[in-house]
Amino acid sequence: MSHPNVLLLGAPGAGKGTQSRRLVDEFGVEHVTTGDALRANKTKDITHLDVEYDTPGAYMDAGELVPDAVVNEIVKTALDDADGYVLDGYPRNESQTEYLDSITDLDVVLYLDVDEDELVGRLTGRRVCEDCGATFHVSFNQPETEGVCDACGGSLYQREDDTEETARERITVYEENTAPVVEYFREQGVLAEVDGERTPDEVWTDVAAAVDERTA
């Protein structure tokens, strides 16, 4: 049985992590994120790409943006190794979008649409497990024990970039960069827009239906 290839788009706080985990559980796909792929390949030799540093980790350690050529190759390797995937955190610009379209066949592109003020509220109240990455919220989805992850018992913390000012900056940058990506896939006829301002279960109903429809 083949598994679907899903691209998940949405601003920070849109609920991509929650929906990605459910896609993994329901459809048996692999969750591929740019960050995880880069961290797993920190020491990969990239001298053949004719870039400044010899490994992806060198860019990360220097706090510099990893070039598209490097990110593209790392993502391609991760997708090639996956029997179905949900891709999150890539592509981030038009160049990466065109590259992705050239190396894989997407069954559906899901865009979680959430208003900016709602996103800010979600981000500033978000708490993340330092061990397993599970997310909770001070206003909704609270853990059973304050400060403790329900899933693994790890400690919960607030990310440094989850302040209101930083959250709005992140959202603005994301929307500026991703608007052309969304439009690209809309024109390709593979985009499914989902109202992300509802409960996770309600959002999931539409997410699962969109994947089922495109892979039937």
From Swiss-Prot:
Pathway entry: Purine metabolism; AMP biosynthesis via salvage pathway; AMP from ADP: step 1/1
EC identifiers of the protein: 2.7.4.3
Binding site for ATP: G13, A14, G15, K16, G17, T18, R126, T135, F136, R198
One Gene Ontology cellular component: cytoplasm
InterPro entries noted in UniProt: Adenyl_kin_sub (IPR006259), Adenylat/UMP-CMP_kin (IPR000850), Adenylat_kinase_CS (IPR033690), Adenylate_kinase_lid-dom (IPR007862), ADK_active_lid_dom_sf (IPR036193), P-loop_NTPase (IPR027417)
Keywords: ATP-binding, Cytoplasm, Kinase, Metal-binding, Nucleotide biosynthesis, Nucleotide-binding, Transferase, Zinc
Gene3D superfamilies attached to this UniProt entry: P-loop containing nucleotide triphosphate hydrolases (3.40.50.300)
GO BP terms, alphabetized: AMP salvage
UniProt: AMP binding residues: T34, R39, E64, L65, V66, G89, Y90, P91, R92, Q96, R159, R170
Pfam families, A to Z: ADK (PF00406), ADK_lid (PF05191)
Binding site for Zn(2+): C129, C132, C149, C152
Subcellular location: Cytoplasm
GO molecular function: adenylate kinase activity; ATP binding; zinc ion binding
Region (LID): 125-162
Reactions it catalyzes: AMP + ATP = 2 ADP
Chain spans, region NMP: 33-66
Subunit note: Monomer.
Domain note: Consists of three domains, a large central CORE domain and two small peripheral domains, NMPbind and LID, which undergo movements during catalysis. The LID domain closes over the site of phosphoryl transfer upon ATP binding. Assembling and dissambling the active center during each catalytic cycle provides an effective means to prevent ATP hydrolysis. Some bacteria have evolved a zinc-coordinating structure that stabilizes the LID domain.
PANTHER family for this protein: NUCLEOTIDE KINASE
Protein task: Catalyzes the reversible transfer of the terminal phosphate group between ATP and AMP. Plays an important role in cellular energy homeostasis and in adenine nucleotide metabolism.
Protein family according to the UniProt entry: Belongs to the adenylate kinase family.
Matches recorded under HAMAP family: Adenylate_kinase_Adk
UniProt-recorded name of the protein: Adenylate kinase
